[in-house]
């Protein structure tokens, strides 16, 4: 079974894909076309995904919009479109966009300050100060990516799963963080 989890940042996709891979006894190929992958690595990863029988991978709209660097042909896009046609497609969304934005801001700022990684947990409370303009930039990015997700899913048969319906308190990251938005 090929399975694509199409979502946006901070929607529980890491846990969801890990669980799905265990449940279906398949390989978890994670963010196989991540924006930090080189073009050649994306081609290699897409080719691997399409030739692997039992695999799950997650993709965000930002990954899709960055498939092809300027000057390259549509090799990655053609393979990706073929993968979408051959895969079960699950869309993961959040009902609470404000919580999604806050989670994204916290993850970005914790990573930039080297206080914690994208998926790290910790017990001691951390206070983060975020300039209003930076917060708005991140909020606009998440909002735009959610809109892009809506455009993409119109073209494919899919199942929608909501983060709030599967992410119990035990599954959520333990991150006691106070976020202060400053002018």
PLM regions with names:
Residues 1-54, 59:
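PAPS-dependent sulfotransferase catalytic core
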Residues 61-159, 163-181:
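PAPS-dependent sulfotransferase catalytic domain
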């Amino acid at each position: 079974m090929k399975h694509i989890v199409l979502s946006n940042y901070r929607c529980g996709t890491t846990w969801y894909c890990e669980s799905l891979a265990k449940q279906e006894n398949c390989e978890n190929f994670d963010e196989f076309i991540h924006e930090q992958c080189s073009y050649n690595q994306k081609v290699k990863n897409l080719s691997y995904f399409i030739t692997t029988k039992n695999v799950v991978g997650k993709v965000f709209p930002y990954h899709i919009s960055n498939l092809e660097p300027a000057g390259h042909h549509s090799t990655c896009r053609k393979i990706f479109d073929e993968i979408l046609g051959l895969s079960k497609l699950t869309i993961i969304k959040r009902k609470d966009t404000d919580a999604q934005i806050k989670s994204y801001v916290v993850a970005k700022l914790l990573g930039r300050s080297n206080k914690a990684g994208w998926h790290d947990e910790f017990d001691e409370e951390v206070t983060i100060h975020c300039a209003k303009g930076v917060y708005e930039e991140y909020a606009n990015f998440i909002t735009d990516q959610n809109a892009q997700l809506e455009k993409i899913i119109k073209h494919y048969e899919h199942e929608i799963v909501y983060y709030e319906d599967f992410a119990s308190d035990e599954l959520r990251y333990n991150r006691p963080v106070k976020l202060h938005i400053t002018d």
